[in-house]
């Protein structure tokens, strides 16, 4: 049974996970088969942003890279929202140019994120990773075309509100196994584990490995 993990910082199963790394660590990553690389809002620096963007431009030419991220907006940590937004829009442009989905970090900035999506009209999928919001927020995100990825901690009502074709599963930094998280999610949604794994596999193939 395949338990695909779309976002992890702890490499364990290279054939069935996407290892997420920030641009400043990209050169040290070698073991993982599939990578996502981006400029995390926590690590944005005004004096070094052009270098960060140049590393990202070069990194996404690597065939291991199947997504841009994590990237996004964070009101609790990082530089000003204006600066975060300007860099995020440049990452959006790169994702569109290279046909790559985006794995998004969003903290207390969902209104801003939705407005950016509405104004930029992206053609590539946007996945909000580690979603912990409530049911109403989950429904709003789905309405605006986002995919939602759930990890070790989640609101069950929000999880159940997500259509299966918009759902992903991840470990992020958790020490829990991806199998355990799949089991929790299957139980919360009242579905068979095999049905969940097969559905997520289809989503992964459609979003990250499209022909």
Tell me the role of every PLM-derived stretch.
Residues 1-211:
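Mid-domain alpha/beta scaffold segments of enzyme catalytic cores
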């Amino acid at each position: 049974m395949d338990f695909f993990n779309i976002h992890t910082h702890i490499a364990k199963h290279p054939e069935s996970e996407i290892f997420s790394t920030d641009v400043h660590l990209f050169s040290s990553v070698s073991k993982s088969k599939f990578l996502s690389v981006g400029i995390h809002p926590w690590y944005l620096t005004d004096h070094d942003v052009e270098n960060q963007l140049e590393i990202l431009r070069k990194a996404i030419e690597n065939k291991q890279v199947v997504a841009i991220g994590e990237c996004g907006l964070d009101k609790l940590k990082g530089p000003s929202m204006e600066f975060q937004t300007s860099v995020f829009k440049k990452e959006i442009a790169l994702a569109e140019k290279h046909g790559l989905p985006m794995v998004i970090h969003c903290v207390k900035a969902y209104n801003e994120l939705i407005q950016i999506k509405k104004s930029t009209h992206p053609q590539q999928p946007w996945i909000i990773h580690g979603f912990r919001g409530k049911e109403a927020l989950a429904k709003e995100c789905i309405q605006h075309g986002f995919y939602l990825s759930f990890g070790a901690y989640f609101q069950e009502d929000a999880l159940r509100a997500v259509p299966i074709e918009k759902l992903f599963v991840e470990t992020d930094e958790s020490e829990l196994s991806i199998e355990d998280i799949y089991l929790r999610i299957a139980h919360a949604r009242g579905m068979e584990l095999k049905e969940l794994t097969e559905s997520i596999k289809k989503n992964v193939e459609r979003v990250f490995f499209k022909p």
